[in-house]
Amino acid sequence: MFTYEAPTADVTAVPVVQLMTEPKYQAVVKPYMQARIVNLEALCQVLELDVPETVAFDVQDETAPWNGGRFELRGGTLERVVQTEAPQLSGGIQAFTQWLLGYKRLSSLLLTGELRTNTPADFEPVDALLTRQQPVLADYF
């Protein structure tokens, strides 16, 4: 048996295994610690995502229903809306967590289908404001 251990950055930079329909090798990602957004509106306020154009997030969160729904990001503030004319980015809270906290890039999440939009260019200004390195969770007990 051959074992190759890659730096975590390789796993997130090129989602090779996720794109293969039937991989001939087994790739195992050993989770260390996990993060989860439990208040998307508060997180976006802290991140100060002041983008020039309004965009919308359509978030699914089955575990925390208050955290899911449709939101508009306008002037650095995320507000819940019923409907919107703004370009929409949709996906689960896990994918939004990975993107907004810098674990995965938007392009990678779009490529694997974890996030979906018809207008990816509209979300590049948001992506440009985000941290470009993986988060470090130093408290482990």
Outline where the language-model segments fall.
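Intrinsically disordered, low-complexity, positively biased terminal segments
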Residues: 1-141
